[in-house]
Amino acid sequence: MKLIKHVFIIGLSICSIQANAQQIKSTTMTNREIVTKFLNGFNNPEQIQESLALLSDDYSFKNPMVELNSKEEFMVLAKQISAIITEIEIINIAENGNWIAVFYDFGSSVEGLESNVGTEWFRVEGGLIKESNLIYDTVEWRKFYAQMKE
């Protein structure tokens, strides 16, 4: 009888461990899903905090006009750009190990800059975005920011 109890308890434990492992597996996002969720957060102001939570504290961001070296610095920029970015539409996404490359169109509320094509390379480690490099045509954006300073 004791043997049956032990076998029953061991069986329950194994089932419980397997169920827990399945639950953990289903809640873990892939690198591609992490980057997609991050970018989609800019489409909905209510989700932007969830997006920013996907950045590591030492996140580094580069684009042709700025270089930032922390999540805190990027959060200031994100607040500014979320006021003029109207949407991000992912056109294509590719993955190679830790690196995710995304080709997207980002819309803005700035006259003459309503549609902008960019490509951004993200490095993801341990479920967080560690760095990204955004490449886009900045000619008209530089003019826009120069006018704002005047």
What function would you assign to each model-found segment?
Residues 1-29:
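Bacterial Sec-dependent N-terminal signal peptides
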Residues 21-150:
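C-terminal and inter-domain tail/linker signature
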